[in-house]
């Protein structure tokens, strides 16, 4: 059926918007941490992991961490990290908090707590949407899911945005629809390249293709070699990825038309 009713009336777009919303909130967390406890970022692998969110939800700032009961702080970190954060790690963080140059700003601390709560809620919503997408795509037999690096969610977004491939007479027509036609890339300057891109084609499809291309270049030797070739020609990474995305579109178009699974020597 019409790409499973365009993945049930564009659940993929809804997911895209939710993920984008979450990304903005994560940027806000980074900004607030830079104000309240800037040293923390160097003490953890990422600000956006469960243990850090647990820490900042309970102790939203260096001053709160420095004055916290050490045993309670250690318990919070140990539980949230499933035992990976030991008492020595707790001590390291608390000592750093004690000498932090971070500001003590109650309003910012409250904003940090609320922002983390919003991210957690979005995580649940995105997970629910992804489960619905997975249920739909599990009933589809599109060959694009056989391409290394294309997961269910990104593949679903591509299929939903394209719809009926027979509406496109050629791969070039599909490239134009995605805003990836050769004329889009007249300038070698990355900024100009993006300025052209944003005005043309489906931004949802373009996003899906660019992100899919990045993963395909990681997992598929043929695409990886193609990306390296473009980079060796002096092209910026994002411009090289745009070339990989165009190659991916041609591959997807051919596969959908033939119904054949991915061949490594494409």
For each predicted feature, which ranges?
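A detector of single, family-specific signature residues
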Residues: 1-4, 8-266
């Amino acid at each position: 059926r019409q790409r499973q009713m365009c993945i049930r009336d564009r659940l993929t777009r809804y997911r895209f918007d939710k993920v984008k919303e979450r990304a903005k909130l994560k940027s806000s967390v980074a900004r607030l941490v830079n104000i309240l406890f800037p040293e923390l970022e160097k003490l953890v692998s990422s600000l956006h992991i469960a243990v850090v969110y647990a820490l900042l939800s309970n102790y939203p700032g260096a001053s709160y961490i420095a004055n916290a009961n050490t045993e309670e702080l250690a318990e919070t970190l140990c539980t949230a990290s499933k035992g990976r954060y030991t008492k020595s790690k707790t001590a390291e963080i608390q000592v750093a908090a004690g000498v932090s140059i971070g500001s003590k700003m109650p309003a910012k601390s409250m904003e940090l707590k609320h922002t983390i709560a919003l991210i957690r809620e979005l995580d649940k919503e995105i997970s629910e949407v992804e489960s619905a997408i997975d249920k739909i795509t599990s009933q589809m037999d599109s060959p694009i899911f056989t391409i290394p690096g294309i997961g269910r969610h990104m593949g679903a977004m591509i299929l939903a945005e394209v719809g009926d491939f027979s509406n496109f007479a050629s791969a070039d027509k599909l490239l134009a629809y995605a805003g990836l036609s050769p004329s889009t890339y007249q300038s070698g300057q990355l900024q100009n390249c993006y300025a052209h891109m944003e005005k043309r084609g489906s931004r949802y499809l373009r996003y899906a293709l660019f992100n899919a291309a990045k993963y395909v270049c990681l997992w598929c030797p043929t695409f990886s070699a193609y990306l390296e070739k473009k980079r060796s020609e002096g092209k910026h990474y994002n411009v090289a990825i745009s070339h990989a995305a165009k190659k991916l579109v041609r591959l997807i178009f051919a596969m959908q038309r033939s119904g054949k699974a991915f061949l490594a020597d494409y």
